[in-house]
Swiss-Prot record:
PROSITE patterns with a match to the protein in the record: ENOLASE
Protein name: Enolase
Binding site for (2R)-2-phosphoglycerate: 162, 349, 378-379, 400
Record family assignment: Belongs to the enolase family.
UniProt remark on cofactor binding: Binds a second Mg(2+) ion via substrate during catalysis.
Species classification: Bacteria, Pseudomonadati, Chlorobiota, Chlorobiia, Chlorobiales
GO biological process entries: glycolytic process
């Protein structure tokens, strides 16, 4: 019987050198290990990441309290449970915490346990994790959102918007799409060097040069696509119709430059201009007309529901509008967004909500209501590649896991290559059909 015998946590370091939680789950016949990611630009509605707060140790970012919660309270509660009963395990974790935002035990403690249990369950059944979670129909490799140029909170430069990404849609296989992304990444590096610009990378592996404007950033990415020998879409392609091979995705992380007191979007790092919600929506409308943009994440601030509605009404029929800080992988927040008819996609970050079951529920709710789901990493990552497995398990069709550098990002891309190989002829790459616009 796959009965949980021991749950053991430890403090390890993430890709930014900050402490995070790693959990091992042991049964008589199987073992699972999971490491928890951490964000830089976090939404105020996210589940609580429990930190120690001792400024003299890891600058207050230690996670020994969360580790202790796993090794005592959670270990005692889960011992004797069947590791294959994922929903029961996650329900037990939620009951142990008892708070709406996981502030008692910490979402970082709960998530590590939840994912490690899933891995131990998969090992017990002899199935890969994507098959264990998703069943026999799990066969869709995701279109990657590759973050090749960074700004905002992810970089020390003059670019307001956090992520400029490429999406290789005009390919029949994931491996070909990955090659396209890698070649564009190297073309962009060469282009930046030729212009005397920095090729230092940000937290997620994208370049972070000092540029004159946000417009220069997106234009450099488009130039790199052509330099690599690929065809960027046109603004009228609407999801890659025609001969487009690559489209652009953005994550401005607008909550980071929204002044709630002024109710203005303030471009602090570049032009210093201040925009109302209507003006910000019109700004994105113009960009969607001028550039081959297929997806915008957090185009408006997390609590600017009015702004989100304006933006959705303006371009939601032709651009994927992804809610990250808006929805925070939370089914209740997503349900509110569906009711208000804002956005048309949800970003899925497992540590925003804290358990695998709640993550899968959010994805299911999105799909049932015609929203797409984008499985995502965090800026503080580890070598753990669970999100690659979840992307295939749920047939999400899209994944956001950084640039073509830094091994913490490449671990996810390489895991998807292995899954594609394992699926062999069953593997599907959706390309432009991953979008519903």
């Amino acid at each position: 019987m796959p009965i949980i015998r021991k749950v053991l946590a430890r403090q390890i370091l993430d890709s930014r050198g900050n402490p995070t939680v790693e959990v091992d789950v042991y049964t008589e016949n199987s073992f699972g290990r999971a490491a928890v990611p951490s964000g830089a630009s976090t939404g105020i509605h996210e589940a609580v990441e429990l930190r120690d707060g001792d400024a003299g140790i890891y600058l207050g970012k230690g996670v020994l309290k969360a580790v202790d919660n796993v090794n005592t309270v959670i270990n005692d509660a889960l011992k004797g449970m069947l590791v294959t009963e994922q929903e029961e395990i996650d329900e037990a974790l939620l009951a142990l915490d008892g708070t709406p935002n996981k502030s008692k035990l910490g979402a970082n403690a709960l998530l590590g346990v939840s994912l490690a249990c899933a891995k131990a369950g998969a090992e017990y059944t002899g199935l890969p994790l994507f098959r264990y979670i998703g069943g026999t129909m799990a066969n869709t490799l995701p279109v990657p959102m590759m973050n090749v140029l960074n700004g905002g909170a992810h970089a020390d430069n003059t670019v307001d918007f956090q992520e400029f990404m490429i999406m290789p849609i005009g390919f029949s296989s994931y491996s070909d799409a990955l090659r396209c992304g890698a070649e564009i990444f190297h073309a962009l590096k060469s282009l930046l060097k030729s212009k005397g610009l920095s090729t230092a990378v940000g937290d997620e592996g994208g370049f972070a040069p000092n540029l004159r404007s946000n417009e220069e950033a997106i234009e450099l990415v488009i130039e790199a696509i052509g330099k690599a020998g690929y065809k960027a879409g046109s603004p009228t392609d609407k999801g890659g119709l025609g001969e487009a091979q690559v489209m652009i995705a953005l994550d401005p992380a607008s909550s980071e430059f929204y002044d709630s007191a002024k109710k203005r979007y303030v471009f602090k790092k570049s032009s210093k201009q201040e925009l109302t919600s209507l003006e910000m929506a019109e700004y994105w409308e113009k960009w969607a007309s001028d550039y081959p943009i297929i997806s915008i994440e957090d185009g408006m601030a997390e609590d600017d529901w009015e702004g989100w509605k304006i933006l959705t009404d303006k371009i939601g029929s032709r651009v994927q509008l992804v809610g990250d800080d808006l929805f925070v992988t939370n089914s209740k927040r997503l349900a509110e967004g569906i009711e208000r008819r804002v956005g048309n996609s949800i970003l899925i970050k497992v540590n925003q909500i804290g358990t695998l079951t709640e993550t899968l529920q959010a994805i299911d709710l999105a799909k049932r209501n015609g929203y797409t789901a984008v499985i995502s990493h965090r800026s503080g990552e580890t070598e753990d590649s669970t999100i690659a497995q979840i992307a295939v398990a749920t047939n999400a069709g899209q994944i956001k896991t950084g640039s073509m550098s830094r091994s913490d990002r490449m671990a996810k891309y390489n895991e998807l290559l292995r899954i594609e190989e394992e699926l062999c002829g069953q593997a599907k790459y959706p390309g432009a059909s991953a979008f519903r616009v």
